[in-house]
Regions:
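N-terminal propeptides
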Residues: 4, 14-16, 20-53, 64, ...
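Glycine- and acidic
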Residues: 24, 49-51, 146-150, 220-222
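Solvent-exposed, acidic/flexible segments
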Residues: 30, 34-37, 58, 62, ...
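Short loop/turn motifs that connect adjacent beta-strands in outer-membrane beta-barrel proteins
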Residues: 30, 54-56, 76-87, 104-117, ...
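Outer-membrane beta-barrel domain signature
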Residues: 55, 150-156, 186-189, 224-226
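Bacterial N-terminal signal peptides that target proteins for export
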Residues: 1-9
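Outer membrane beta-barrel
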Residues: 168-261
């Protein structure tokens, strides 16, 4: 029953956006939820340099980020950015140079740009002993102080050594992929190697199709889904371009990005 209901809702949503232009946008990898770019974009939006961000659905793609950086550039022509905000802008513009060049028409052929995007090495210490905390009675809980936005990984007691790398990019205009291997060591689990995130992304017309494992933030706040939880393996459909619902029973949504996942 639930599957039929989901299929019916999906069909209704697809029908509601059937008027979307048939041109196929560029497919790019997503920006991981733990990227500092999200705080940069939020700050640019809060300061009035970006006005076109649909709320509630993350991660955003690299192409989305590039569009918003171009929007911020246009606004900054009449409203100069403060120094700290200019630093954020310059960092993102340099990283998204290929996507921006494509949007500006400077690069008609978007070739393979899969590369090592980020490397992280982290040393963490966690005190897992309940006796270290001043409670009169013990409580039935597992202690994970200050462990947040960690894709569901738990710290071991004592010293934790963690390393990971993000490899991502587009193979061509129609196919992108991302892979994030992770290694950690602590005295509880000793060595642990895993794939933190990994997915392929393509499209069917204006619908993006993603298959794999990645962290998702859903809704106005990360209550139900966020990178506090373990990334789930899923099939996700979404509009590569946000759509404005001008009429029909979904008119109340206004501008939104439709997402369906299983």
């Amino acid at each position: 029953m639930n599957k039929f209901l989901m299929a019916g809702i999906t069909a209704g949503v697809m029908a509601a956006v059937s008027s979307v232009a048939t041109a196929s946008p560029l497919v790019t990898a997503n920006v991981p939820l733990d990227s500092r770019y999200y705080s940069y974009i939020d700050k640019l939006e809060g300061m009035g340099y970006i006005k076109d961000i649909p709320t509630g659905t993350r991660p955003y793609s690299r192409l989305d980020m590039a569009k918003w950086i171009m929007e911020a550039q246009q606004v900054a022509a009449d409203k100069p950015m403060p120094g700290y905000l200019k630093t954020y802008y310059n960092e993102m513009r340099a990283d998204l140079a290929e996507e921006i060049a494509y949007l500006q028409g400077d690069s008609k052929d978007y070739g393979s740009n899969i590369k090592l995007r980020a490397v992280e090495a982290r040393l963490a210490y966690s005190d897992m002993q309940q006796d270290s905390y001043r409670y009169r009675k013990g409580i039935n809980a597992s202690w994970q102080p200050l462990n947040r936005n960690n894709n569901g990984y738990r710290y071991g007691d004592g010293i934790n050594i963690i390393g990971k790398a993000e490899i991502a990019g587009s193979l061509n205009k129609d196919l992108a992929l991302s892979l994030t291997p992770r290694f950690s060591y602590d005295k509880d689990q000793h060595g642990d190697a895993s794939i933190e995130e990994g997915y392929v992304k393509t499209h069917l017309g204006v619908w993006g199709i993603e298959l794999g494992k990645q962290a998702v933030q859903w809704g106005k706040a990360p209550f139900a889904m966020s990178n506090n939880a373990t990334p789930q393996t899923m099939l996700k459909l979404n509009l590569l371009e946000p759509h404005t619902f001008d009429n029909g029973f979904l008119k109340f949504l206004g501008k939104a990005n439709v997402n369906v996942f299983y």
